[in-house]
A protein has these predicted regions:
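Flexible, low-complexity linkers/stalks enriched in Thr/Pro that connect modular domains
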Residues: 359, 490-505, 510-512, 609-610
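Exposed aromatic-hydrophobic patches
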Residues: 454-460, 578-584
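Short, solvent-exposed loop/edge segments of extracellular or virion-exposed proteins
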Residues: 370-376, 508-516
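Short amphipathic, basic-aromatic surface patches that mediate peripheral association
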Residues: 392-402, 514-517, 531-541
Length: 610
């Protein structure tokens, strides 16, 4: 099925070959990794460029036990293992061996990689079907999987080591992304930015765990982790665990993972009961990740950062008008490492389909006017409490308007970049500054007709009044195609005219659906549904002033939950929208639920149901 998908969807020539066919032809019927490489080299050496091998998918788990001496072995598709078996750095499994195909290369996996290689670490027919289903669903645009999660990247950094991991992400990786792919919105989860919590099992950072889970569940295109890790998760604080991975239900918005850490995805243990955290990410049938660029053994921080920078430079660069496939990304990035110790690069593998691409939006969204002024004129300044009108178009790669594009536009207008600081909680670490652009001026939805759109909103009173550039972020889609774009031609700051609005929002609060009545019986995890409206707009800016959408259970403020991110504006309206939030598990008995909401001029309302 996966081969048929690539034939029909991508126009690729695809062959499906069994282990036995290869062994019979190239190693007298005996299992041998060299046989797989020889077969790949045969296809690679074909003279016609259109027939030359480009991608190799190893469809099955691997094991360091080639000869099946261990009972219940996971030896489905052979792995290449180093001669070294005692040194934990220089002993590793690698699939690169199968792709080093030029003459006089390949001995001990030395040389440049000529094809893109990935692996599905599957052991059963059920796992295999699940992996194929996920890939086809991810690659096929539909109303089910398109969304502005495709505009978001998340970067996670460990603490310790004198801020090494933090500095690699904040000072090197993120600036690169902001330079080569500024259309994407960055979230940052730095362990040292959160106050540690002491527990019987050591220091934990539950806010970091919650941030990672929120990104996965709500949708993010890619998650990058830099720091210490292992087969059971990330960081000494356990900011990502196997139990958390298995609980993810994000099938409609599966991210790619880049993990510059140690043996997070060791797949070659022969014990089928010993499944690494990275494998669980890929094998989660309810979501998890669509692919991982990840490690099978110990890794080195110095090599990790070099490979990571090349990875992103390749991932977000077009060649002949097209973005690379996953196999291209990992092979090009490794080859660009050049003089680095090969063993510290070879242990990075692709768990996923090498012929798949990241879910890049295909087309562009462009702002044409702000408050009636063409965007190419002097940057407009938008103060608090002022009405704003944006106009724009959807374009193709040549910047020609797509007049046949009808769909919806998701828009986020960000306030200025803010500067925060880490805490320096561990010995050897120190407080260090980092930037984040995460406060919203407006979030909404608009109709796109014949490739054109208009958005109107009111700037909240709660913005940062200093002057600086904001960011407009767009994501447009219909049932078959999508587009994204951004603009920083928007100066935000200062104060406009005082408002005469002194009336708070209207709130209609329900559990599960609009048929709910006070006193009704519900399950232990009901859905909070709140319809909100206000003539000036709902405040979801979330800048810590306290004017958030907040739900409180039984009048206990310790249970309060901020619901700004669960608010969705109604189509073509900044004055109304709905909150949908799955409540945490409730104990049996009677309860009350209070919802407090503010408008953009800081008038509040609240309502309570029981």
């Amino acid at each position: 099925r996966l081969a048929d998908h690539h034939r029909l969807f991508d126009g690729l020539r695809v062959n499906v070959i069994t282990n036995e066919q290869i062994y019979n032809e190239f190693s007298s019927g005996s299992p041998d990794p060299a046989a797989i490489r020889d077969f790949a080299r045969l296809l690679y050496q074909r003279p016609a460029a259109g027939n030359k091998l480009r991608y190799l998918l190893l469809f099955g788990d691997g094991s360091y036990d080639f000869k099946d001496r261990v009972p219940f072995n996971t030896n489905k598709v052979l792995t290449f293992q180093t001669k070294e078996s005692l040194n934990t750095v220089y002993s590793y499994a690698s699939d690169d061996f199968y792709g080093i195909l030029d003459a006089n290369e390949g001995n001990d996996a030395v040389g440049l990689i000529d094809i893109g290689i990935g692996r599905f670490p599957v052991n059963t027919a059920e796992e295999a079907k699940m992996a194929v289903d996920k890939c086809i669903f991810y690659a096929t645009n539909s109303s089910l999987n398109m969304g502005d999660w495709r505009n978001k990247l998340c970067f996670v950094a460990d603490n310790g080591n004198s801020n090494t991991h933090f500095r690699q992400v904040e000072k090197q990786i993120c600036p690169l992304i902001e330079n080569i792919a500024p259309v994407y919105n960055l979230d940052k989860i730095y362990i040292d930015a959160y106050k540690p919590v002491s527990t019987p099992s050591g220091q934990k950072c539950p806010d970091a765990n919650a941030g990672i889970t929120s990104n996965v569940q709500n949708g993010v295109l890619l998650i990058n982790y830099t720091g210490h890790g292992g087969e059971t998760g990330w960081a000494e604080e356990g900011i990502l665990t196997i139990s958390e991975i298995k609980s993810w239900t994000n099938y409609k918005n599966m991210p790619v993972f880049m993990t510059a850490t140690c043996e997070f995805s060791r797949y070659d243990d022969p014990d089928p009961a010993r499944v690494s955290a990275g494998e669980h990410v890929f094998l989660n049938p309810q979501g998890g990740g669509i692919a991982l660029f990840t490690t099978t053994r110990l890794a080195n921080a110095g090599t990790n950062i070099g490979l990571t920078l090349y990875f992103y430079d390749t991932l977000f660069s077009k060649s002949n008008g097209e973005y690379p496939r996953f196999g291209d990304v990992i092979s090009y990035a490794k080859n660009r490492m050049g003089g680095f110790d090969a063993s510290l690069v070879r242990n990075f593998v692709l768990l996923g389909d090498p012929a798949l691409r990241l879910a890049y939006p295909k087309y562009n969204v462009v702002t044409t006017h702000i408050n009636g002024k063409p965007i190419n004129q002097e940057m407009d300044t938008i103060p608090a409490m002022q009405a704003v009108e944006l106009k724009g178009i959807v374009t193709d790669g040549s910047q020609h308007a797509l007049t046949n594009f009808d769909g919806e536009l998701d828009i986020k207008v960000f306030d200025k970049v803010r500067t925060l600081s880490t805490l320096g909680s561990l010995p050897g670490d120190y407080p260090d500054k980092y930037t984040l652009q995460d406060n919203f001026v407006y979030q909404g939805r608009a109709t796109v007709t014949d490739g054109e759109f208009t958005v109107q909103f009111m700037v909240p009173r709660d913005i940062d009044y200093s002057y600086g550039p904001g960011k407009i972020s767009y994501y447009a889609h219909n049932d078959v195609m999508d587009a994204n774009g951004f603009s920083k031609k928007l100066m935000i700051g200062g104060s406009g005219n005082e408002s005469t609005d002194n009336v708070g929002p209207e709130i209609s609060l329900f559990l599960n659906d609009e048929k709910f009545v006070n006193g009704a019986t519900v399950g232990d995890m009901p859905l909070l549904v709140a319809h909100l409206s206000d003539v000036s707009g709902i405040n979801t800016i979330g800048n810590s002033i306290g004017h958030d959408i907040v739900a409180t259970l039984d009048g206990d403020n310790t249970t309060s939950v901020v619901l700004n991110s669960y608010y969705s504006a109604n189509l073509d309206s900044y004055q109304s929208g709905v909150v949908n939030f799955k409540m945490p598990q409730l104990p049996e008995g009677k309860h009350t639920l209070t919802l407090k909401v503010w408008d953009v001029f800081n008038n509040s309302s609240e309502t309570t149901i029981s």
